[in-house]
Each structure stands twice: as structure tokens, then as C-alpha cells.
Amino acid sequence: MRMKGLLVTLFVIISTSVFAKEYTYKEVKGDLTKTRIYELKNGLKVYLSVNKDQPRIQTYIAVRTGSKNDPAETTGLAHYLEHLMFKGTKRFGTANIIKEQPYLDDIQQRYERYRLLTNPQERKKAYQEIDSVSQIAAQYFIPNEYDKLMASIGADGTNAFTSYDVTCYVEDIPSNEVDNWAKIQADRFQNMVIRGFHTELEAVYEEYNIGLSDDGRKQFDMLLSKLFPNHPYGTQTTIGTQEHLKNPSIVNIKNYFKKYYVPNNTAICMSGDFDYNEVMSILDKYFSEWNANQPIKPVEFPQYPQLTPLKNNIETSVVGLEAENILMGWRAKEAGSFQADTLEVVAEILSNSKAGLMDLNLEQKMKYLGGGAYFVGFADHSIFAMQGMPKEGQSLNDVKQLLLGEIENLKKGNFASTLLPSVINNMKLKYYKSLESNRSRTDMMMDAFINGTKWSDVTQKMSRIQGMTKEQIVAFANRFFNEKYVAVLKNQGVDSSIVKIEKPAITPIPLNREAQSDFLQQVVNAKVQPIEPKFVDFNKDLTKGNTAQNMPVLYVKNNENGLFTLSLRYPFGSNADKKLSAAADYLSYLGTTKMSAEQLKQRFYELACDYSIYVGDKETYVTINGLNENMPQALALVKSLLTNAKVDNEAYQEFVSLTIKSREDSKAEQQVNFKTLAAYGKYGEYNTYRNILSNNELKTIKPSDLIQSLKKLINYRHTLLYYGVDDLNKVIATVNKEFKGTKFIDAPKGIDYVLQPTKSNSILLAPYDAKNIYMIQYHNNNEKWTPENSALIGVFNEYFGGSMNSVVFQELRETRGLAYSASASYVTPSRKDVPEYAQTYIISQNDKMIDCINAFNSIIDTIPQAQIAFDLAKQALNKRIATTRTTKFGIISKYLESKELGIDYDINQQIYKNLPSIQLKDIVDFEKKRMAHKPYLYIILGDEKNLDIKALEKIAPIKRVTTEQIFGY
């Protein structure tokens, strides 16, 4: 919505040419990100923003196409292509492209025939032939060479994602590696080769399996299908259908790539530590060759029928094991429209987790279990959504009426006149904080490019929002919410529509560990100006002080913006008082003798400040953050709440009911089940998830006893942590004033949660009805951590199981197609008195469980050795440490972490110093000593009736535990 009077132009677009080696750019005057926008001669867009916080650069390469452009007969294609972009080019990923290509062509033709077959026996035979030819082609395939290239330049966060409108390739690189990065990416986008096809297809299908248990995704897909019945947003999903995934077309993939992966449909987005002109010179050198001899033709996108208005409200449903809820959605204009600004503000007015209409009228008054409102922007159309979860005995229709009731309050203007200004201030606060992140900046660039938004409109967003009035919002709400909606009820039950597909017979492809392309060697041997590491010096980077009552203070100055974080750290947690966590949750529903709970939340929101209470295993944090100028008022509010919280017995009974319902809902979630099962396996019955007040204890305890735990908390000795604008003396004076007269006592001692040793092989099995298993193999021999081993363990984890170039990723995913996600690590503790342990992790299809166990045990008992991979792992860790900067509140966190480990220095300093001496033999010997041929606890969450229990029993005795046992309620 473009409101009159809102577009007071604060910035001026600079459209004059600025020459730097003939590169013309545009920028917006007053843009806080100082983004420059360039365009190469082939139409490739480049967005650059300098941020010298760390010597690293966040890079996106965004292609303006996604799943909405998938051919209707091969949905999931855009996402699958994203995966294949990691398989290499004509220059890397292959030992000999000339010899390899005929077999790749043969595989392509065979898949075209295979996808048309319907007879099961014929399909099985054809797949066996594809598998056989793939074995021959794999002789020339060098798996994961892209990941080796990224490791060699010290890249971090190697990834990609596909959505409806965009496919984006992500890297975080050292600032001295732009030339190598650009060289690799330019080759990748110009010379992509489809190889490793059938094993990667299985990885995609494993990703699909994970989604089958994600009821939220299922619900959202249904919402889209009803809101956009004749647009790809609603007619097809990004992951694709089972049938299409099992019947792919390489021909269609190549045609899609040729049509959409062109320079004038692509943008490079970079934010970090660099020189604009130098980066543009490099990008021009490598990317200007892309389609250089072809005329720039506008990309022709499919045209879709115009959406007709919904004639009636639509109600539909989906079913799944997770907790029931309702999702409602209204159609909105495209994300690049000014209407998006207004809907983001409307969402914050309704739900901002503090003082929105839904927060105060529904959640605070415990009229439902919880919910929210949000805007989802797409390039063609968007969605305004509301969601709600019922409390015990409440129907989804009841929740729907509550949500619609808040829409009516919005339309009638039934909200405080202070709410909109508070929303605007908090949105500005969030925006300014986001600018600290390179990734947030590249997100903004990508969204602007994909949605066709002018950069001037992006930078002026806050000024447009600043001018909005309550009257305009109310008028808009009456127009917008006059349209019909779609409501999707998420019912709880078994989804009988999910079809099980048997695993294909895949012959593991060779890894060719010692092979490397000339291209990789060139990049590895390229000379770059090294970046010297900078380690935290706790004597220089951190200031220490004491309050008047001798509470230690750790202080770091904020020289960047007007924000602060103040945290009171108490040296005990749930291990000393299991009431604390429930007390902290209950506190959010209470006021004081002077202010109601609603008034407190409104006041915090008006101050653009927030507070939280985190109860950990061995420490508790009371944290306040927000605008530094309002810190004294925010601290006073928190102190008053903790000291003078007013018990509300009626609210407590409702709180107990909601808590029990929330607990039951969490027992229906697969990932929560696995997290809880893993804790049960590693720690036994006494662990952080079970050491809570039972349902019966919640019902019988006096609410005043809960609040007494928090009132006592404020009197325990603690450490003050501050990152902000004020100088140390002013911070101490503020705290002294607030805590004057308080008599502090020593904190209580807790009983530690203890990691259990593994004395023999055993299996812990818990039930969850899904098409896949979650599994951990855990070994603990009570080895104690020493700083001298840190470098060795760091290299081992990088080499064995911590990256896409690791042994685990290659063996489990690349060669066998057993999983979408697989990893392993030797876990070091956060405290010196806690042992180290070894752990593997995988999510896989039920009928692949034994294959996964056998594969893991094989590489654990005989660790594969490859000097090339080891050298790259060491190089990656070296460059990552050299370009990592610990800043801001992170300095305080690093100090506390070091103190818990019993050292007084930055551990990265020792790792960096010891790295050069680590050899492949060292990590092989380490693995043999700590992991190979050792007893393991196999922690498995899965549907027993679909698992090979007889094969499992041959590995170790099985201990079955119920859902109630692992949760403790």
C-alpha cells in the first residue's frame, strides 16, 4: 500500500556514472549499507556493501528462478539442479571429461527411457543398468571436489537454497580469496556438468522423507494450494512429488539451466571487508566471459492466469502426528509492493511477542496456547498469515474465532495510541541491528533483485514506515481483511496418504580419494596475501570492575550503535533448583503491585527494550537488551518484577493447564523426541529434559513457592556482563543504585548431569511413526579434555565428519546415497570437569538403517586415509581461524568459556600455533585410540514395525523405552 504523505524522500538516488576502471555503479545517498550496484556488459548484476567488522565476505549468487518455473511433469527440478551444481564442471570434479562424457550421455538417455516405464520389473532392470553405467562413469568422477575447492580457500557455510522464486548459492570466504572464489564460481555457472546423478537423487529423496514428518510444511503447502489454485505457488512444491523425484529428466534439467541460468537473470551479492574497485575488477575478469558472444535476451518466464478473487472463505485440513493448530492466510500483493511495508507493520501490531494485540489479549490472558501473525513475501503474490494453537479442550474453530476477533480489534482501532509508535521504533531497532550482519545485508540485496525492487525503495523503507498513522493502518485493515481467507486445520493423527517407496539397489561409487583435477591444484597453489590472525587478549579487550557490593563486572565498549546488552549471570541452574524454569515461564504472566502484566509488557516495548530469563544446566542468566538510553528504566522494571511479582492463583491454574498441553504437544514432534532420547541415552534418567517439575508437582506446588525461587535469585551473588555505549563507571553507578541495600548470599550448589560411559555395545530404541529414523552412535570412555589436544581434535573433526569434504559425508551420502544429513565428531566439553566423547549422527529412510550402521562402523573401525583431503582439512581450519574475529559481546562470552575450561587465553591461539605440526598419521592414531573398535550406544528413534529388528539384535541387546520414559511425563 502506497500511503499519501509517507514518501518524504530522505535519500537521493545517485545515477551519475562513477568511473573506477570503467565500472559504473549506482548508489543511494544516505544508505547505511553503502551498497553499490553494478552491471557487467552481459547483464550480470553485482551488489556490493563494505563492512570491515571481520576479514571475511558473505557471498550470494542468486538466480531469479525457483520451483515455480519447474516443468509440471518434473516438479522438484530447480531444487535438484541446486544439488547438482555441487558436482563439478568440465574442469573440476572429473579426472578426464573426454572419457567421462560418453557415459554421462548414456546415463541421460537411459533416464529418459526409465521415466516412461511403468512395469515394476522393467523399471528395476532399467535402474540396474543405470547403476552399472554409473559405476563406469564414476571411475572419472572426483566426488566433492567443489567442497575441496571451498576448503582450500577457507570458505565457511558452503550451502545453497531453493525457494519458489530464487535459487541461491552461498559462501562465506576470507577477504583475500575473492580471486579464487570468483574463478571457481564463474566456471561453475558456465561449465556445469551433471554427474553423480543417481546417488544425489537419493540424497534429495532423503530430504523429501524428512519433510514428510514436517506437518508445518504440509500445512503451508495446503494453504498455498487453496490461495493460488492456478499459480505454481499452489500447484507444485519446491521439493516436488514422490513420482517426479523417482522419474527425473536430465534433459529437462539441462533445458532449465540453459534458459534461466544466464547472466542477465543472475546477481552476485557480497558484503564484507573488501575494496569496491578491486572486487569489481576480479568479477569482471571471470564473469564477463559468461555468454560474452551472445546478445542479451530478456528471460521469458511462464505466464500464469490472473487470480480471481476468492468467492468464499475456504476451510480445509491436513493430518499428521504433530500437535494440532490452525493456519489462516489472506492473499497479498507481491513482495516488492509498498503494501508489503504495511503488512509487516500490521503483523507487528498483532503479534510482536511482547505487546501486540494477540500477545496481550490472547497469549497473556491464556485464551489459547500460543500463536502469531506474519507476512510471507513472494515475487508474484504474497501471504498474510495468522496461526494459533489450542489449549486443552479447545477446538480449532474456537482458536479461529479468537484470531478473527483480533482482526476485528485491528479494524476498529481497538489498540493503544502508543502501540504503533512503539512498533515503528522496535522495527527500526531490529533493522539497525541487522546491519551488523553481512548475511542480513546480502539477504536484502537478494530480495531486491529477485522481487524487482529498486534499491532506493529498499533504503527508504524505514522512512515510509515512520510516516504511518493509526488512522491509515485502520483504514487499510478494513480494506485488506474484507477479502476472503483460507483456513487450514492441522489435525492430529496418522497420515495414510504417505506412500512408502523401497530403497533402490545402489552400488557404492568409488571415491577416488587421491585423484585431483588440475583446476584444484591451481587453486590450492595460488598465492594470496595471508591474513594474520587476531586473538582475543582478555587483558586488553575486556575491562573488569566491581560493584559497590563486590559483584564482578565484565565490560566491553560498544562503539558501533546505541544498543546495549546487560546480563546477570548466576553460577547455578536447573541442577540446583528445578523450579526455576517453570517459575521463569510463569513470571511472564504476572505483574507487580504497581503494574499489571500487560502494562509491563507495553512499557518494555515502548522503551524498545526486552528481557529474558534463561535457565541452563549450571547457570542462569537474566538478560536485558535494547536502546542504551533506556537501560536504567529497563533494569528498574526487571528488578521490580523479580522482587515484587504479584502471585495470581487463577492465572497459575491456567498456566499449569497450558504447560501440560504444551508438553503433550512436544511429545508429538519427531525432532523433540530425538533430542530428548539422545539426552536420555547420554546422561541417563537424570538429565536436563527430565529434571523438571512433573505434571503432578506443577498441579500441587503453591505458585508463591515458584515465585519465591525468583525472588531469591536476585539476592544470589552473580557476575554482571555489559556490552554497550556507557562507560564502565556509569554502568556500575546504575547497577549500584538499583541494588543498593541488597544483601547478597552465595549461590546454591547443584548436582551435575553426568555423561554416562559406554562399557559395552547396546541399543536404545524409542518409538516414532515416520518413514525415517534418527540415529546417533555414542561412545564415552571418560577421556578428559586438555588444551594440548585442541588442534588435533579440530583437524580430526574437519577431516572425518564435520564438513561436506569429510569422510562421513562422502561415504554415507556421496557414494551410497544413504542420507541427506550425516556427520560425526569427537565432542569436546564446555567445562574442564566434563569428559569428551565420540558421536555420529544420521537421518535416513527406515529400510536403510542397517546399511547406515554398517557404513559408519566400517569407517570408524578403519578410518579412510587421503593425504589430499587431510591437507585441505588442515588448510580450511587454518584459514578459518586466521579470519575469525571475536568482537562485541562475543569477547565476554569467550572469556567465560575459557574460564570454564580452566584457561586464561583464547584457545584458538593454541590451535593455530599447533596446527602446522599435525600430520595425517596423528589423526589416524587418535581415531584408532579413541573411536575404533570401541563399544557404542546406538540411540535410535523410529517405527519398529518398519525396522530390521532381527539384524539390529545381532549388533547389540536392545533396550526399548517409551515416549513417557524419555520425557519423564
Name these PLM-found stretches.
Residues 5-14:
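Sec-dependent N-terminal signal peptides
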Residues 77-85, 583, 796:
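Active-site His/Glu-centered metal-binding helix of metallohydrolases
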Residues 187-194, 287-294, 404-415, 640-649, ...:
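A common structural junction motif
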Residues 49, 54-67, 76-78, 94-187, ...:
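M16 family metallopeptidases and their MPP-like homologs
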Residues 18-48, 275-319, 324-325, 329, ...:
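Proteolytic maturation boundary segments
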